[in-house]
Amino acid sequence: MDCSSPLSLFHLLLVCTVMVKCCSASDLHYSDALEKSILFFEGQRSGKLPTNQRLTWRGDSGLSDGSSYHVDLVGGYYDAGDNLKFGLPMAFTTTMLAWGIIEFGCLMPEQVENARAALRWSTDYLLKASTATSNSLYVQVGEPNADHRCWERPEDMDTPRNVYKVSTQNPGSDVAAETAAALAAASIVFGDSDSSYSTKLLHTAVKVFEFADQYRGSYSDSLGSVVCPFYCSYSGYNDELLWGASWLHRASQNASYMTYIQSNGHTLGADDDDYSFSWDDKRVGTKVLLSKGFLQDRIEELQLYKVHTDNYICSLIPGTSSFQAQYTPGGLLYKGSASNLQYVTSTAFLLLTYANYLNSSGGHASCGTTTVTAKNLISLAKKQVDYILGQNPAKMSYMVGFGERYPQHVHHRGSSLPSVQVHPNSIPCNAGFQYLYSSPPNPNILVGAILGGPDNRDSFSDDRNNYQQSEPATYINAPLVGALAFFAANPVTE
């Protein structure tokens, strides 16, 4: 929920009262899952680890990142199971962590400080990347092909730590606008707890968005094989420009951003119907975000975004005239074979966020002759979250360290190799592959990691080398944090 809006909180809790039951032994422990979903980010940290680091099998890493280029790029997150820092997915992760805290932070009082710490670990890095060199944004540390040819702990890595940036000559509107969105969203989160930091975030977001908008182009074109096929901007940069402007408007309340949205929306994707929300494609997320302005503030020019949000919602609801989503026999939303759970967590978050907006305005989604209520959206989101946490045909939790049965062979270098505490001597590049292909479980539990997940028949191979199913990623976890906060406060039933 929008924690700055007591009315929104009241409406959402009022709707949930008819759905809440007393907790029993059969209830999933959403509070435990919430805590672990945030803890996961400590396993992805790059840089000098703090004294309160809880995943103690990790150590310091990447302490000279950027130094050979005379910039400080220490910190941030490794994106997944490797030792690379990719700017586009890291910025999206940051935006989604921030959005989750904005909407649902007041429902996780015991975890909100940990959530803010996870967010700040990323924003501190993004601030460095945004301000190190004028008219430039640093968007990557590490050479992907060299990194992937090794199986090394981040504490040992000796592969090239090349640094890549976008600039006025080699633009990257997609990654820059996403970075602006991340910084703007985070500025809302820190508005009450650290006003000077919040101001710095917003000021930087404004500058980065100006850079993204003025020097247009895709970072995939500028950087080529450095980012492709790993994190190509397949959707282009229009979606990020509209997304970034939307977040800057929400964070700053500056009317110029609403003017930008109204003047440029149609050319930047406002009329598109799209059915996936991810680190690459922000169109659906933007529509949900802007629908708030119509539903709660009655900004008529934003009604279009509510209409397209309804189209997205209707595509997910079986029985509606425009239903087109694919679900596995066990009920999991299925979008693709590689890291499918990234789409499940982002969809669950959007369902709950839109339910919040509908509740606060007394609205509903229109699917032809069918009316879809906030309660319907909450129910569908719960099915997806519960599937991830173990209510599925395999009776397996896809969150590492949660529940009685979860994957043991996670595609993650640091987790699969002996920790530096146990094996302080370096394990070289090629020597590490014996651990990739070994049969014992990972020696270090990457608590809270959500993996890529099962296939379209609910089948999962607990195989460390099957990265499509067994690799975690920050952008899989980030949307789930807000969703788990909601269900921890509201263990709703059908």
Curated annotation (Swiss-Prot):
Coiled-coil spans in chain: none
Cleavable signal peptide: 1-25
Swiss-Prot/TrEMBL GO biological process terms: cellulose catabolic process; fruit ripening
Sequence intervals crossing the membrane: none
Family annotation (InterPro entries): 6-hairpin_glycosidase_sf, 6hp_glycosidase-like_sf, Glyco_hydro_9, Glyco_hydro_9_Asp/Glu_AS, Glyco_hydro_9_His_AS
Identification of the protein by name: Endoglucanase 1
Any matching Pfam family: Glyco_hydro_9
